[in-house]
Amino acid sequence: MIILYVHALAATGVVRNVRILAAELAARGLAVELVTALPGGEGVTGVPHHALLAGPYPSRPREKLQAIAALRRHLQSRGQATLISAGNHGHGTAWAASQGLRDVRRIYRISNDIMRSAVGAPSGGLGRLGRTAMARLLARDADHLVLVSPILADTPAFAGAARAGKVAVIPNGIDADAARFLADGPVPHRWMGRTPPVILAIGRLALQKNFATLLAAFAILRRQRPARLIILGESRDRACYSLRAQAKALGIADDLDLPGTVDNVFPWLAHADAFVLPSWWEGSPNVLLEAMAVDVPIVASRSAGNAVDLLDHGRCGLLVDPADAAAMADALARQLDLATAIRPGDRIDHFGLDALSDAWVRLLR
C-alpha cells in the first residue's frame, strides 16, 4: 500500500502534484491511498481518500498533534506500507507519526527550497535554523528523499543522504494536451485581448513570490510603454492591502488588478501577452509548466526552482535576477515586443507525465 500524505487537499501546487501522482500510480496498477489531516477538497477518481480528523481545530499546533496521533494509528492499521509525505508542510507530521514503525517505508518529497538560498531572499532568521534542523532530521530518517529540482541537491543537509544513495530527483510534469484543452475558453478578463498588453503573474500573495520587486519592475516598464499587470492568487487582506499601497505609491494602481484565485488558470495564461514568475525560491513550479504548455512568452527568476532547466538556460524564456527590478523590467519589455519575444515552443514536451510516472514506479518497486 502506498499512502500519499498532505495536510489538506487545498488549492496549492503541492496538492495538484499529489493528485497527478496518485492518478498516475493508480493507472500503473499500484495500490494508492490519499490521506489528509483535514476533510474536504477535490480527490482523485478511483483513489480512496481518508481524512484523519473531523475538521480543523482553533489551534494549529493542537491540530498538528491530533493529526500525528491519528496518522500513527492509521499507519499501524495498514501494516506494511510506503508513506510518501508529498509536501514540505506535512513532513513534520509524517516524521513524528511514523517513528518506530518498522513496516513503514518513508519517502519525503522535498517540494520547495528549504534553505531559501537566493541572494536577497527573506530567510526567516530563526526559522531558517528550524528548517535546517528539520532537513537534517528528514535526511537521516528517510528511506528516500525525492527532490523536485536538481538545485535542491545542493542543500548541505542532504549531502549525507546523497552519498548513501537515498536521493532521487523527480521534477514535476504536466499533461500539455489537457492544458491546451483547458485553455480553449473565452477571454477571462476585460483587459485581455486588446491593448495595452497584459502581463500575468500567478501565486499566493506571499513574500516568497517576490511581487514587491515585480511591482517595482512594472513601474519602470510603465515609464517606457503602456501595459497592465494582473496577479492571480490567494491572499490575506493584509497582503493585498500592502501590494495595493505599493502600487499607489509607484503610480501604477490603475494598471494593476488582483482578482484572487480562479478555478482554471489556463485561459488566463493563453490570453496573456507575457507571463512572469519573480519568485525568490520555488521547487519545481507548476505554474511555469502551465505557462509553457500554452506557449506564452515567459520571464522567470533564476532562483525559481528549476526554471533555468525548464527554460533551457534562457533559450525558451528570459531569466533574471529576482532582486534586479530594472533587469526584470527590461526582460518584460522584450517579451511584450513581437520582434524580440522568445516563446517556449515545444520545450514542454520534455516534461510530460510519462517520465514522472516512470521515475516514481522505479523508485517504489
Regions found by a protein language model. Give the residues of each.
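A conserved mid-protein helix/loop that constitutes part of the nucleotide-sugar donor-binding site
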Residues: 15-20, 197, 201-222, 241
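Glycosyltransferase donor-sugar binding loop
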Residues: 35-41, 174, 202, 228-241
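Membrane-proximal helix-turn-helix segments that form the acceptor-binding/catalytic region
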Residues: 72, 126-145
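Short His-centered aromatic/hydrophobic patch
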Residues: 85-92, 110
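A short, active-site helix/loop in glycosyltransferases that binds the activated sugar's phosphate group
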Residues: 140-166, 174-178
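Aromatic "clamp/platform" in nucleotide-sugar-dependent glycosyltransferases that forms part
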Residues: 261, 280
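Short hydrophobic beta-strand element within catalytic cores of glycosyltransferases
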Residues: 297-301
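Conserved acidic donor-binding segment of nucleotide-sugar-dependent glycosyltransferases
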Residues: 302, 311-314, 318-325, 333-339
